[in-house]
């Protein structure tokens, strides 16, 4: 007995949607996590924005975005990182 292609496609789509809905993280899966930090301080003039990584990430981190749109992970416990974050919050 052959299963029509359309029925098989519907079944596969349904299964993929269910796996998203019943996933332990669901739609709240973090977008960006830090697995390592930059080893040197990034010059402040290159930084335009920052955000904190999700609490679901294995390592805490601050992700800085540069003028060229690049992202770099920094250790939130370092003094220069805290200064940059405070400065960016004041300018927001």
UniProtKB/Swiss-Prot annotation:
It is found in: Secreted. It comes from the Eukaryota. GO terms for biological process: antimicrobial humoral immune response mediated by antimicrobial peptide; calcium ion transport; calcium-mediated signaling; cell activation; cell chemotaxis; cell-cell signaling; chemokine-mediated signaling pathway; chemotaxis. Residues 1-19 form the signal peptide. Gene3D superfamilies: 2.40.50.40. It holds the Pfam family IL8. Keywords: Chemotaxis, Cytokine, Disulfide bond, Inflammatory response, Secreted, Signal. Disulfide bonds join 33-57, 34-73. Its main location: secreted. GO terms for molecular function: CCR chemokine receptor binding; chemoattractant activity; chemokine activity; kinase activity; phospholipase activator activity; protein kinase activity. One of its GO terms (cellular component) is cytosol. Monokine with inflammatory and chemokinetic properties. Binds to CCR1, CCR4 and CCR5. One of the major HIV-suppressive factors produced by CD8+ T-cells. Recombinant MIP-1-alpha induces a dose-dependent inhibition of different strains of HIV-1, HIV-2, and simian immunodeficiency virus (SIV). Belongs to the intercrine beta (chemokine CC) family. Self-associates. Also heterodimer of MIP-1-alpha(4-69) and MIP-1-beta(3-69). Interacts with CCR1. This is C-C motif chemokine 3. It comes from Canis lupus familiaris (Dog). The lineage of its organism: Eukaryota, Metazoa, Chordata, Craniata, Vertebrata.
